[in-house]
Structure formats: C-alpha cells, structure tokens
Swiss-Prot record:
Protein name: S-adenosylmethionine decarboxylase proenzyme
Main function: Catalyzes the decarboxylation of S-adenosylmethionine to S-adenosylmethioninamine (dcAdoMet), the propylamine donor required for the synthesis of the polyamines spermine and spermidine from the diamine putrescine.
Family to which this protein belongs: Belongs to the prokaryotic AdoMetDC family. Type 1 subfamily.
EC top class named in words: lyase
C-alpha cells in the first residue's frame, strides 16, 4: 500500500515557560531539527504573540514543519508532514529531549493520502 505523505503530530506537556518565551532559541531549534531530518528549508514564517506564545512554520521541499507554543499552559504542538519519507519518531523525540525541557510527550503517526 502506498501513501502520499507521513504526518507526525507531537504534543509536549510540562514545558519550561522561560524556554518557550525565548523565540530566538525556538527558531534555531526548529531549523536544526529540519537539518537533522535532512530536509531543505525553502521558506519560513514566525509570529510572536503578546503577551506570550509563538507560532512558526518551515516550508521544506518535502512539505512542512510547524510549531505552536502556549507558555501559559506549558504546552508545545509540533507537526512534521512530509511527502517523501517516514521519520524515526524515536530519533525526533530524542532530539527534542536534548533541546527542550518537558515532562510528557504524546505522538501520533498518520499515513496520509492512501493511493490504491
């Protein structure tokens, strides 16, 4: 069976407030994640909300990586969607553990666009 894409949905709970408010750090961490996944960034957009929170999107040649933070809820949502390859979610979680402070992670792996 063939699919058009692979979608990894990552929810991080119990995140560090100060780290989530450090948008420069989050942006660099996201770019490093894209490089670690061996993807090519073709566009990017970032927005800082007030009084807090941040959203960012990297358009990669394979699709996209997005992040949304809710410091007031100690939560981060990350989506990685690609049309070219599946990623090892364990390696991605290991990368996130090295670069972010959080207490709990939930992951959903979704195969998208089934082709008969």
């Amino acid at each position: 069976m063939k699919y058009s894409g692979y979608h990894l949905v990552i929810d991080l709970f119990g995140c560090n407030f100060d780290q989530l408010e450090n948008t420069e750090y989050i942006i660099e961490m996201l770019k490093k994640l894209a490089r670690a996944l061996d993807t090519k960034i073709v566009a990017k957009a970032f927005h800082k909300f007030h009084p807090q929170g941040f959203s960012g999107a990297l358009i990669i040649s394979e699709s996209h990586i997005t992040i949304h933070t809710w410091p007031e809820d100690a939560y981060i949502g990350i989506d990685i969607f690609t049309c070219s390859k599946c990623f090892d979610s364990r390696k991605i979680v290991a990368y996130l553990k090295e670069n972010l402070i959080f207490k709990k992670v939930e992951i959903k792996e979704i195969l998208r666009g089934k082709i008969d």
